[in-house]
């Protein structure tokens, strides 16, 4: 079955992840992510209790992300191929929290596919932008990717931090991703 607004390659990404012979999940727990964000914001020192970083930041944990719309504009050889997408965020109960609208550009195809990503996430309490370069091959092996996040409006305005992204359910079509966002 093809969903008209999602490119078939995106729908099959979970199947590709299931076929990977090297599965190496490396989740970064939310406390470690908060320490990194608080250190980057100058609100935390290495000597501080790691758990204290959680109190200094806005933490969005146990989010699920999946494609609602994904369009690929192919280029010969793959490099320069662009992707436009709208992703849905749900909480642990399956309640829709908002969307991320963004784009990606394929930077390199071999031996790993590297992509530049930029998106703006709109939630009821504000928005933030995520930017970074991710290793899609590593992601198919269920390795966690980290993007830089900057608050744009609402309770996120003026704050910065990080977002993690990892395939959580490759059996879904499109696959579901586990997301954590921490801004300080």
Swiss-Prot record:
Keyword Lipid biosynthesis: no
Outcome of swapping residue 9 to A: Loss of catalytic activity
Pathway note: Antibiotic biosynthesis
Disulfide-linked positions: 57-184
Signal peptide: none
Outcome, altering residue 115 to A: Leads to a 60% loss of catalytic activity
Keyword annotations: Antibiotic biosynthesis, Disulfide bond, Isomerase
Record EC number: 5.-.-.-
Disruption phenotype: Cells lacking this gene lose the ability to produce pyrroindomycins.
One term of GO molecular function: isomerase activity
Reactions accelerated catalytically: 4-[(1R,2R,4aS,5S,8aR)-2-[(2R,3R,5E,7E)-3-ethyl-2-hydroxy-5,7-dimethylnona-5,7-dien-1-yl]-5-hydroxy-1-methyl-1,2,4a,5,6,7,8,8a-octahydronaphthalene-1-carbonyl]-2-methylidene-5-oxo-2,5-dihydro-1H-pyrrol-3-olate = (1S,3R,6R,8R,9R,11R,14S,15S,19R,20R)-8-ethyl-9,15-dihydroxy-3,4,6,20-tetramethyl-21,23-dioxo-24-azapentacyclo[20.2.1.0(1,6).0(11,20).0(14,19)]pentacosa-4,12,22(25)-trien-25-olate
Principal EC category: isomerase
Residues that hold (1S,3R,6R,8R,9R,11R,14S,15S,19R,20R)-8-ethyl-9,15-dihydroxy-3,4,6,20-tetramethyl-21,23-dioxo-24-azapentacyclo[20.2.1.0(1,6).0(11,20).0(14,19)]pentacosa-4,12,22(25)-trien-25-olate according to the record: 115
Gene Ontology biological-process entries: antibiotic biosynthetic process
Organism superkingdom: Bacteria
Keyword Cell membrane: no
Transmembrane segments: none
Pfam families assigned: AOC_like (PF18678)
Reported function: Involved in the biosynthesis of the spirotetramate antibiotics pyrroindomycins. Catalyzes the intramolecular cyclization forming the spiro-conjugate moiety in pyrroindomycins, via an exo-selective [4+2] cycloaddition reaction.
Record text on subunit structure and interactions: Homodimer.
Misc: Reaction occurs via a unique trapping mechanism whereby the lid-like action of the N-terminal tail imposes conformational constraints on the beta-barrel catalytic core, which enhances the proximity and polarization effects of reactive groups (1,3-diene and alkene) to drive cyclization in a regio- and stereo-specific manner.
Domain notes: The N-terminal 10-AA residues are absolutely required for enzymatic activity.
Protein name per its UniProtKB record: Spiro-conjugate synthase
UniProt source species: Streptomyces rugosporus
GN (gene name): pyrI4
């Amino acid at each position: 079955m093809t969903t008209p607004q999602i490119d078939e390659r995106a729908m099959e990404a979970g199947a590709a992840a299931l076929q990977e012979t090297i599965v190496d999940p490396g989740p970064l727990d939310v406390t470690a992510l908060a320490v990194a964000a608080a250190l980057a914001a100058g609100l935390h020192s290495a000597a501080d209790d790691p758990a204290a970083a959680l109190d200094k930041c806005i933490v969005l944990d146990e989010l699920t992300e999946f494609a609602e719309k994904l369009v690929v504009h192919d280029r010969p050889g793959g490099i320069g191929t662009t992707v436009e997408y709208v992703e849905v965020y749900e909480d642990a109960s399956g309640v829709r929290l908002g969307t991320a609208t963004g784009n990606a550009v394929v930077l390199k195809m071999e031996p790993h596919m590297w992509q530049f990503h930029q998106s703006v996430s709109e939630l009821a309490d504000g928005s933030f932008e995520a930017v970074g370069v991710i290793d899609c091959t590593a992601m198919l092996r269920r390795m966690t990717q980290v993007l830089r996040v900057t608050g744009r409006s609402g309770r996120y305005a003026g704050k910065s931090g990080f977002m993690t992204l990892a395939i959580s359910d490759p059996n879904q079509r499109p696959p579901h991703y586990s997301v954590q966002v921490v801004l300080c």
